[in-house]
């Protein structure tokens, strides 16, 4: 989301980077611009579906595309996302992802005493539909729109989609931690402020970091 990117982007800006961001929500963009000003970080934001980002941003012009954690689950097609990434990057440009692991998304979090794979690991045509009043954003106001639609994408599907768009994978690390309590009742906070399984954390990857470079640079 732009909110998350704004707070992280100040470090990138210190390296004299020119940054752009895309989101389909006018409200999210307004908040993102406020945070960017607060961080004294100029970011060129555009209101657009991420699949249309290559139509509102200059194609083949970016040195780095960053996809933040918790973004891919909102996208129905990982191939279309990879097409967008490939269209935006210049030859030699890099993609960086920190994302929740698809194995984690396949675990049913309603079981607070066990790990049960009960949800799709691979991309499906139809989304998972949730009706939930909870949000990761701190707010005192009740949510009016509580229905969400999500898709999982297997790690192989993600890698294959990027390879098909002319990117080479340069790094892939699976992590035993994630920034939020993804499995309530089964996690503890570690010394870095991230959450991990309190019992036998080696059982399940919770997130991953992927880096790739567009061929031709």
Which positions does each model-derived feature cover?
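Single conserved hydrophobic/aromatic residue that forms the stacking wall/gate
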Residues: 1-9, 13
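Conserved SAM/SAH-binding beta-strand->alpha-helix loop
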Residues: 25-27
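Conserved SAM-binding strand-loop segment of SAM-dependent methyltransferases
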Residues: 38-53
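A short acidic, Gly/Pro-enriched loop at the edge of an enzyme's catalytic core
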Residues: 55-65
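A short SAM/SAH-binding and catalytic strip from SAM-dependent methyltransferases
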Residues: 63-79
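A short glycine-rich, Lys/Arg-flanked "PGG" loop and its adjoining helix->strand segment in the class I
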Residues: 79-94
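Conserved class I S-adenosyl-L-methionine
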Residues: 94-136
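Short alpha-helix
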Residues: 148-172
């Amino acid at each position: 989301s732009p909110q998350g990117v704004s707070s992280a982007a100040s470090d990138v800006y210190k390296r004299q980077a020119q940054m752009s961001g895309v989101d389909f929500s006018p409200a999210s963009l307004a908040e993102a611009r406020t945070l960017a000003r607060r961080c004294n970080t100029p970011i060129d934001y555009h209101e657009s579906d991420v699949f249309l980002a290559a139509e509102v941003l200059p194609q083949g012009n970016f040195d780095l595309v960053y996809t933040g954690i918790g973004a891919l689950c909102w996208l129905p097609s990982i191939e279309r996302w990879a097409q967008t990434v490939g269209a935006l990057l210049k030859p030699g440009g890099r993609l960086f992802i920190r994302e929740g692991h698809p194995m984690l998304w396949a675990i049913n979090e309603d079981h607070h005493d066990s790990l049960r794979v009960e949800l799709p690991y691979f991309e499906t045509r139809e989304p998972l539909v949730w009706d939930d009043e909870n949000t990761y954003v701190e707010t005192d106001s009740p949510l009016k729109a509580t229905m969400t639609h999500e898709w999982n994408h297997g790690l192989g599907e993600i890698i294959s989609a990027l390879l098909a768009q002319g990117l080479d994978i340069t790094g892939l690390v699976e992590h035993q931690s994630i920034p939020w309590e993804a499995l309530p009742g089964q996690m503890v906070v570690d010394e870095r402020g991230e959450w991990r399984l309190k019992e036998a954390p080696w059982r399940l990857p919770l997130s991953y970091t992927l880096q790739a470079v567009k061929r031709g640079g």
